[in-house]
Amino acid sequence: MNKKYDAIVIGGGHAGLEAAFAISHKGRNTLLLTFNSKKLGMMPCNPSIGGPAKGIITREIDALGGMQGLWADLATIQLKMLNLSKGPAVRALRAQIDKEKYSQLAYEYVLKQPNLELLEGVAEEVIVDENGYFKGVLVENIGLIEAKVCVITTGTYMNSRILRGQDITTSGPDNEKTTPKLSASLAKLGFTLQRLKTGTPPRIYSDSINFDEVEQEVLSDVNISFSSRSNLKKPKQIACYLTYTTPETHRIIEENIHRSPMYSGVIEGIGPRYCPSVEDKIVKFPDKERHQIFFEPETADGAITHVNGLSTSMPIDVQELMIKSIPGLRNAKVQKWAYAIEYDALDPLQLKESLETKLVHNLFTAGQINGTSGYEEAAAQGLIAGINAALKLEDKDPIVILRNHGYIGVLIDDLVTKGTKEPYRMLTSRAEYRLLLRNDNADDRLSEYAYNSGMISKEEYQKVLDKYKLIDDEIQRLNTTYLSGKSDVALKYNITNGSTLLNVISRPDVDPSDIIPNFPYLEEITTMVRLHGYIEKQKSDANKAVRLENLKIPEDLNYLDVKNIAIEARQKFEKIRPATIGQASRISGINPADIQMLMFHLESRNKKNYDQN
């Protein structure tokens, strides 16, 4: 095999796949190193893509030229648009995925991808040269493989262990391998590691479930997709089911809580706040009589059911009692028991906005190693890290997505500016400009980034420009066209003469298809018209913030020279080393006075340099 590459990507999960495809797409010779080539893009937790905010991230990945949206569309077995009764800012797609098909698609695409080589192996050590640049990776039973750049995407596999009660196994998810030596290697290089935890529920053989005892979910009528490249018809919808925990479930958990590693002190890692274990729910919400449990098929044949909402680290004998206490599962046969998994992750404050590490040049990290949870968050980071690794090879500036341009920008900015001590999950509430970051306009927001970084072609970019020109032209036409008071539409909605079509379509009681029945982008134009004032207000606010993003802070700035700032501010500036005034202002504990003094210092420094020149 070749032992020299332009790039090495460690890990074949959602982050690693996006990174490998991005770098190889840009013509760089890339090695994707993974434990098991037949388990690329695994879904060890819930078999779904999308959801609030997360579905918009997948749309953004597609707009940037990534793969997750396309594969999700091809493997979808149920699709719904969430929050339809709410505003456009929080609407998002969620797809139930055939997890085996998704993994198979990833494998097939990897084999067909030019400039991309797949290798099974265990990364043991990151090698750095005397100047602090990444040099290569030591691989078990193979030796040193050299490359110019590297993206580490180890997920939950780094120095991981699985816990069920007192039964503790050193392994990755689903009894895969783990990488304790790689974790030790990063610590030796000076990286600060933290211990995190997540969990997964049991899987049940579907033919042992009594579906008559549970509620079938109402299927949505959605004809939309994550990817602009899939051109799929609406998938055949496969139902999920809803049931609940019972007082008996709660009694079993309460009586055995001392046997949960979460509460016996065995687990050191911090778990995800927004995806708690079932024992966590019972302990933290003792007054709640029941908790939702969803039965979700893992594949199109529906043979195995994922019991969403029953994540636990209880021992197997307790799990069995819990499962039998839930309606529909009285006679359940378990295919896989639930478990908690603990793993090493980096403190993301050690990263630049490009996701390159501050300690080692040309070394990038992405996904759960950076302290996030979720397939979508991982894929987004992998894509950005991959693009920026390739741009580094071209000696070009990295792409940094602004907070008003994408949830991906919010995600990365939060990580590298604020850090996280628990698995970070993207929420709509984290985005201050969420009305701008809608499900319907990801291509408008991000296609320029994709084109400028070489991820989409000129033709693809022009297609997006043409789409929004068509929308703008139609808005102009609507604004200059008046509705006859005698028309069917006017009579239907009791509209008098003198109203423009734009005014008519802006009314929430009007069906826009009555006004422009054949317009191809009905959702986009309706949202833009009806929320025009609110959108313009958020754009104005965002533009003010962007001015601070344009005020760069030199990498070599000595913060000891900055006078009249708080000691806490000086320490945080020194640790995080923000790239811009905007980023500096978002650091926790930094007050406006500190920012003013920092700006004053930079102005004085720039004036002094100008005078000297």
From Swiss-Prot:
Keywords of this entry: Cytoplasm, FAD, Flavoprotein, NAD, tRNA processing
The keyword Nucleus belongs to this UniProt entry's keyword annotation: no
Stretch forming the signal peptide: none
A Gene Ontology molecular function term of the record: flavin adenine dinucleotide binding
Subcellular location, principal: cytoplasm
Record-linked SMART domains: GIDA_assoc_3 (SM01228)
Cell compartments where the protein resides: Cytoplasm
InterPro entries named among the record's database cross-references: FAD/NAD-bd_sf (IPR036188), GIDA_C_N (IPR049312), MnmG (IPR004416), MnmG-rel (IPR002218), MnmG-rel_CS (IPR020595), MnmG_C (IPR026904), MnmG_C_subdom (IPR047001), MnmG_C_subdom_sf (IPR044920)
UniProt: FAD binding residues: 11-16
Record-listed NAD(+) binding positions: 271-285
Bilayer-crossing regions: none
Role of this protein: NAD-binding protein involved in the addition of a carboxymethylaminomethyl (cmnm) group at the wobble position (U34) of certain tRNAs, forming tRNA-cmnm(5)s(2)U34.
Family statement: Belongs to the MnmG family.
Subunit structure: Homodimer. Heterotetramer of two MnmE and two MnmG subunits.
Name of the molecule in the record: tRNA uridine 5-carboxymethylaminomethyl modification enzyme MnmG
Native source organism of the sequence: Mycoplasmopsis agalactiae (strain NCTC 10123 / CIP 59.7 / PG2) (Mycoplasma agalactiae)
